[in-house]
From Swiss-Prot:
Its main location: membrane. F(1)F(0) ATP synthase produces ATP from ADP in the presence of a proton or sodium gradient. F-type ATPases consist of two structural domains, F(1) containing the extramembraneous catalytic core and F(0) containing the membrane proton channel, linked together by a central stalk and a peripheral stalk. During catalysis, ATP synthesis in the catalytic domain of F(1) is coupled via a rotary mechanism of the central stalk subunits to proton translocation. NCBIfam families: ATP_synt_b, PRK14472.1. The gene is atpF. F-type ATPases have 2 components, F(1) - the catalytic core - and F(0) - the membrane proton channel. F(1) has five subunits: alpha(3), beta(3), gamma(1), delta(1), epsilon(1). F(0) has four main subunits: a(1), b(2) and c(10-14). The alpha and beta chains form an alternating ring which encloses part of the gamma chain. F(1) is attached to F(0) by a central stalk formed by the gamma and epsilon chains, while a peripheral stalk is formed by the delta and b chains. Belongs to the ATPase B chain family. GO terms for molecular function: proton-transporting ATP synthase activity, rotational mechanism; proton-transporting ATPase activity, rotational mechanism. It is found in: Cell inner membrane. This is ATP synthase subunit b. It is a single-pass membrane protein. GO terms for cellular component: plasma membrane; proton-transporting ATP synthase complex. Gene3D superfamilies: F1F0 ATP synthase subunit B, membrane domain. The lineage of its organism: Bacteria, Pseudomonadati, Chlorobiota, Chlorobiia, Chlorobiales.
Amino acid sequence: MLTSGIILLAGSLLSPNPGLIFWTAITFVIVLLILKKIAWGPIIGALEEREKGIQSSIDRAHSAKEESEAILRKNRELLAKADAESDKIIREGKDYADKLRADITEKAQSEAKKMIATAKDEIEQEKRRALDVLRNEVADLAVKGAEKIIKTTLDADMQKKIVDSMIQDLSTKRN
């Protein structure tokens, strides 16, 4: 019996009742008009405001993206300039070091040549002094030997003439 009551109730709910349909439609229209007057404006306004907020966020995101891309390009340009500048500084440093090395080498070679020339001059001067000393000693020995041989002492001018002629004879014989 309980089951037959449920079936009757379900049947009455599913069967159309024209009065109920009329009043349901009128109630729906009234609620719709009330919602249009009261809630439709704020809902549409909220949706439009939400749309504007979303569009604003999208615009800000696009501008932030463009700005970040511009900053990235600028940073890449600055990095490229810094690389070029560092390469230039390194190249200039190497050039300066090469030039400095060449200058130092040139100065050292020049100093070495000067020292060699000075040493040669000093050797030549010492050689001349030694030859002069040797000539004087040879002249003295020659005079003493000649004195012993001829048993007479020669005066200074005569000795000088004899020594000079002997030295010239020796010089011509050597050359």
